[in-house]
Amino acid sequence: MFHPDGAYSGFAVDDLDAAHRFYAKTLGLRVEVLDGSGFLTLHLGSGGRVLVYGKPHHQPASFTVLNFPVADVEAAVDDLRERGVETKIYDDADFPTDSRGIMREGGPLIAWFRDPAGNVLAVLEE
């Protein structure tokens, strides 16, 4: 019988080792390696989880695959940049952002960044 209660999302990467290092060491998430499966599980502080899997000929997602809600986007961007993460990834014609990559108009304050596979992630102020 189908039960949607435990649903979670997933996305592909081209290098599981690089993804493991980035999500565990750079972002500080708890990352579980699913033995022999070629899958990682990202454990989020909210109790949620995300499946990450290796895919040959991976093409980065052209949309945001994972959003991290934060109380203060400015502080989150400072923290990410101190960890070596680039937050200015879009041309202003696509999404008008300031020099630090924060979009300040048309919705919540948000800054996008990429994982080592090129997938788009974001911090957004709630």
Question: Where does each model-flagged region fall?
Answer:
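Conserved short beta-strand elements that form part of the metal-binding/catalytic scaffold
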Residues: 30-64, 70-71, 88, 106, ...
